[in-house]
């Protein structure tokens, strides 16, 4: 229904726009429709020695983003928590078997507590909030987790969407053959398709004929497919695909690239995996793919989790890469293609497979750097070898350029400028010896990351979270004791009497069971929530360490103390790599997932503060006579401490990265160098001008740190500020006896 309304809007927009057109506008539209189809084209390359503003801003290093809006994710999270057992397959995919079992036990205990509360005899001292409170926390945790894992939501492999994308990919691969010789025929396509099937592949005759028919169909309609692909070559962040293939969005970068490959592996396509070094039985692959969760709502499709992706993605990726060299070898055999290109293609493919086969499930930083540098050098060697033989034919370069994940994720700094070859002279210390070495940006960042990973974090906030979990679990018992007797009379009661008062009953088994179950569920859920906050706190701390070590690079004393390389911004190339390293380190580590956790804590704190202020303004004399108010006060204090920690770390990190005193110091060093070496004054003046421009650019792009959530929208931020601070002002004015304003609207 929504698509029909959208089509109607587009149609009517064009209809009324036709009445406003003049002759000149119609002729211009006809020229625009032709576009670049009839224009002569030749091979071009992006200039690797230039930088984009996206590189300085950091958006070039894009992170994965969810396809669905936050409202849809919130709704799905609530549904998946309420009907937890029915979504067991999804929870198993996005968590682990142990965690799922733990959550299932908590879910069943919570259901049992509700049943016991409704079935227990009415005269008991157990408040409703003691049983209902864990439910709200469970819904919050489920929503947060659903938003965190929302970036890994591939569509079903056997669905219509997957078939449509598979058709587009096959059409795009056929266009590659057409570009190679200009006249690829159906026979060549069919022959290549037959050759791609291995002798030992468990393929049925019907599957072979189906693929042959698909190849012939897409070859006949290749012009139509090419037109549809050409219209969609521009991506969301302004990059244009050079090979005519629709690239993935920058907001989904590498994760979406693997998802597309996972979608192309159906039950019948699983035979490709048997030809790779990381081979798995076709039946196992088929079983794993067909067992994808089918209980998710229809608009999102089943969400394949980490275990499936970690097993199938590498298999499908290796299978697809093994299949493509057969196409190229067959295609270029009749044209006397240089042997160097073919050998280079197989070498690139085999080297990538070797690196993937030895890669563990959780990739370490060292393997990432090694693979990244290796891919860059492999690409450069492929290009140089094939260009020498025949510059018109370069199958290796084209295939690798199309399949390169760094190209797919819009990282021109990583794949175009060859970071493995672009180095700067840096000083390193080995004990008391000072030595000079040529280092790339990846090597410098790798040393910084190793230093951060070796840092031993404190456990203060972990202990604080554990203490708050225990305190919130014991709050109902303390509340009943305080309501029953005064503090002076506690010593007069025996232990058995205190036990009866704390648990609300002595003989009723249902009440005792309900209290114990609520205690276990409450402590467990609160501990999970503060565990997430501790993860966010550790991430913010690592970001601060990244910023600190980055600031130590241009200081000889601090670099030696921190055991990181040291270099000066005395060349334009050094400034470029310094800016690249700065943006790269800012984007390292968890970003959106941690922001989701912090945003949830921020919104929860706002809600708790507002409820507390409303309760204090309503009846502040009997504020502590309600059990939920006790819990709200504890939540408010604990969450405020964590938020203050987040704000402190985030502001300090932004301050470290926005420290223009480094650039000013380097400008002073350049003037000192001009005085000592007048013959290099022109070169040093050029570097000084670039430093001034870099200083202005950083001031232009940098913004102060803000917690995510309502603060992203200025209107909502001002409304929230007015509501919350007005309530706090009213409480303080009521308690102190004079008017006090704590807020001021800012435009």
Curated annotation (Swiss-Prot):
Glycan attachment sites: 291, 659, 718
Compositionally biased residues, Low complexity: 340-352
UniProt keyword Transmembrane present: yes
Record's keyword terms, sorted: Glycoprotein, Membrane, Transmembrane, Transmembrane helix
Topological type in the membrane: Multi-pass membrane protein
Subcellular location: Membrane
Listed name of the protein: Protein PHTF2
Organism: Mus musculus
